[in-house]
Swiss-Prot record:
Record-annotated membrane-spanning stretches: none
Protein name: Uncharacterized protein NECTIN3-AS1
Database matches in InterPro entries: DUF4672
Disordered, as annotated region: 1-71, 139-162
PANTHER family in the cross-refs: PTHR40143, PTHR40143:SF1
Lineage: Eukaryota, Metazoa, Chordata, Craniata, Vertebrata
Length: 199
């Protein structure tokens, strides 16, 4: 019998081959995760003395747990990073406009350059924050239903006639309107700075 036919007829070799392949891919995945994660420092044997030490001690245990079971915690870690990133971005937006204006004041330069550089950047970061908070508030609000109370009250209750539908702006339209406003402000700053420099 040819070896190819023997391999096709014998299921044990095939199962063993797949087992080897699965073990190899798991090993590679584990090595890749270890390469991405930084090496975990050894935890001290003494008990933590303050709250900061407790917070530091919790992080290495989380990292070691993630290295042991990367597939199980992958989705939880992504969700945590997204929530943490949105919170950090929201905090950065509030601080960023002040930092930009402070950072550009000490530099000695012409008034046209500072007036052109600082306001549009601050305004752009402000608008991006507005868009993000608006999108968050739209996601958190549950949809309202107005006709349910009257339907539950009985047949004697007045039935409201549906009036003309109110146009609701979607998030993308609102952000595009804000971008247009931002562009108009930038253009007005440019025109005013050019007029100021020429006079």
């Amino acid at each position: 019998m040819l070896p190819v036919q023997r391999r096709k007829l014998d299921p044990l070799l095939k199962k063993y081959r797949h087992h080897k392949k699965a073990t190899r891919t798991k090993r590679r995945r584990k090595e890749k995760m270890e390469a991405q994660c930084s090496p975990v420092p050894p935890t001290p044997s003494t008990p933590p003395q303050s709250e900061e030490d407790e917070a530091v001690d919790k992080k290495p245990t989380l990292l070691s747990a993630q290295e042991d079971t990367p597939d199980l915690l992958h989705e939880d870690r992504l969700q945590y990073l997204q929530e943490e990133g949105s919170g950090v971005m929201h905090q950065e937006c509030q601080i960023q406009s002040c930092e930009l204006s402070v950072a550009q004041k000490p530099r000695p330069s012409s008034p046209a350059v500072t007036s052109l550089a600082s306001p549009p950047l601050c305004f752009g970061s402000f608008l991006s924050c507005v868009c993000q908070t608006f999108s968050r508030s739209r996601k958190q609000k549950p949809p309202r239903r107005k006709g349910n109370n009257q339907a539950e009250a009985g047949g004697d209750a007045e039935v409201l006639r549906p009036g003309p539908a109110k146009p609701e702006l979607s998030l993308s339209k609102t952000c595009s309107h804000l971008k247009l406003i931002e562009l108009s402000f930038v253009f007005s700053f440019i025109v005013l700075s050019v007029c100021h420099c020429s006079s």
